[in-house]
């Protein structure tokens, strides 16, 4: 069976915003995998920072050695190809593989003039890689879904919705 690989590098950062979303999804997914036989792995860039996760029973943690910018562009794609894995990017991940689904939380840097020029350019390249490679894109609201379709030219039928944060409003 083809493994499913989640990029967990953001779980080395403080657990707020997008890392919080990834944390919540991974910790809730782990017990649901019991008895399914699915091979789910969480890969992360092992640069000495701790991974902020409780012990997982059904998701295998895979540290990958890499320098900062080579992880997403070289090391992780190589790992995915070598293991013929399906990639699940929960944190607006840049990717270079066709067997993938990505959550693109928002495209704020492309629609608002609040970020530095280089960051906006880098984010644009990032979004183009998602458009070119992701089999399916998910986002967090209907408005973002429409914006992603309009600005990036991704057909609406390739963009799904995954709402986040509802449990924090209770």
Placement of each model-derived feature along the sequence:
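Carbohydrate transferase catalytic cores enriched for Leloir-type hexosyltransferases
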Residues: 1-170
